[in-house]
Amino acid sequence: MLEHVKTQIRRFYDWGFRLIKHDFSSIDLCGLWGKDMKFFATGLPFADQTVTTAEVVLHFYEAIREAAQDAVVIGCNTFPHLLAGLAELNRTGDDTSGYDWNRTRRMGVNTLAFRMPQNRTFYMSDADCVGIRPAGDVPWALNKEWLRLLARSGAPLFVSCDPKAATPEVRATLTEAFRINAVQTDEAEPLDWLDNTCPADWKINGQTEHFHWYDELGYNAALDPEK
């Protein structure tokens, strides 16, 4: 199996890809999402019962790293402490959304805050992207706050933008955000993390800043299709 994995990764490399992302390996290997795992991930053993689950996972990550050569590797749905040193970046949270702001707030802001200690320690910690769609989905004012924090977090910045939503203001704001993030000299630390699951107060380069994760009414249920 490891040779098969290497063959596939080498193929991507030979095609010219220099940014390779692997995803869903933890659920493929263990049969469960991390949040659903108890003491045992699965009742089924691996074919080689002389190695532990951790060793199986580590060998898998090492195979990808070897085959990717000098390409940048992004992990996703991984075991962070085992991936450390074997990928330049790692998606550390679930998907954010261009449709549902509450999902971005829960999966993006929360992830950035509580997985920040891994950034530049295990790898660059990717809290997922800013999803920008035309008016009627997530308000630009809220997405702009998320973009402002990500750009200055010292963590990677990714954006998924519908061209129809790329107004002159959006383009100018994105250009400035990428200019800031490309330097990667900023340091950000959540301050109210003990009593806020989506920290709004951050220390950025030694200065305290406040971010607004709610609309003017506090919380707008219309932005959360799941509720």
What are these regions (language model features)?
Residues 3, 7, 66, 149, ...:
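Polar/charged alpha-helical tracts
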Residues 14-16, 68, 146, 152-153, ...:
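Short, well-ordered loop/turn elements at secondary-structure boundaries
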Residues 1-137, 142, 170:
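Aromatic- and carboxylate-enriched substrate-binding clefts and catalytic-loop regions
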Residues 148-183:
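Catalytic cores of secreted or luminal carbohydrate-active enzymes
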Residues 26-27, 79-81, 157, 164, ...:
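Short, solvent-exposed loop/turn segments at secondary-structure junctions
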Residues 183-190:
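N-terminal low-complexity/IDR leader segments of large eukaryotic scaffold/assembly proteins
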Residues 150-153, 157-158, 191-227:
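Carbohydrate-binding surface patches
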Residues 84-86, 134-136, 161-164, 222-224:
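Short conserved micro-motifs at the rims of enzyme active sites and ligand-binding pockets
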